Amino acid sequence: MSTNFNELPVVVIGAGPVGLATAAHLRERGLTPLVLEAGATIGAAIEQWGHTRLFSPWQYDIDSAARRLLEPTGWTEPDPDALPTGHELIKHYLAPLAKLLGDDVIRTGARVVAVSREGIDKTRSAGREQTPFLVRVQAADGAVTDVRARSVIDASGTWGQPNPLGRSGLPAPGENAAID
């Protein structure tokens, strides 16, 4: 494991369209991405509504950096005017992009449970900007590990994390008691 701050990976939380596009942009810039996906597969949230057709055609669904990475591989870009389903988005875009990025970049079944700065707490903050992040990850089998990162990008999305009904991002009185 590298001890040089600039050689540490940039952790991306979530392997959906935004997370994988972020990894493509990082790779283009010569940075090392590490994508951590809580689900068992890339695009796990999309799988839950995969039968649904998107409102936006392919021309708006494919990120430019991802396209630049995919084009030299012989990947066939879908019809830019067609409206894909969630399953088609995964099959024709996310899966090829994930395969290109590789298993060393994407870890599925890896839920981020906490993010902190290494050696920093409420009383120690000197040198914070050059201190690695510490990302605590829980694997599907329950094992917990810490990953050092130069930065962290949250692309986990909102699926399964609904906005509370109350004001200011807080649950309405009684809302938590009514949750199934």
Q: What are the functions of these language-model segments?
A:
Residues 1-8, 180:
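A short, basic/flexible loop-to-alpha-helix module at the beginning of a structural domain
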Residues 8-35:
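N-terminal Rossmann-like FAD-binding beta1-loop-alpha1 element of flavoenzymes
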Residues 18, 41, 159:
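Conserved Rossmann-like nucleotide-cofactor binding loop
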Residues 22, 45, 117, 163-165:
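Short glycine-/acidic-enriched loop or helix-start segments at secondary-structure transitions
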Residues 27-49:
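Glycine-rich FAD pyrophosphate-binding loop
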Residues 41-92:
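Glycine-rich active-site loop/strand segments that organize a redox cofactor
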Residues 76-161:
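Feature captures the FAD/FMN-dependent oxidoreductase FAD-binding
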Residues 156-180:
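Glycine-rich dinucleotide-binding loop and its adjacent helix/turn
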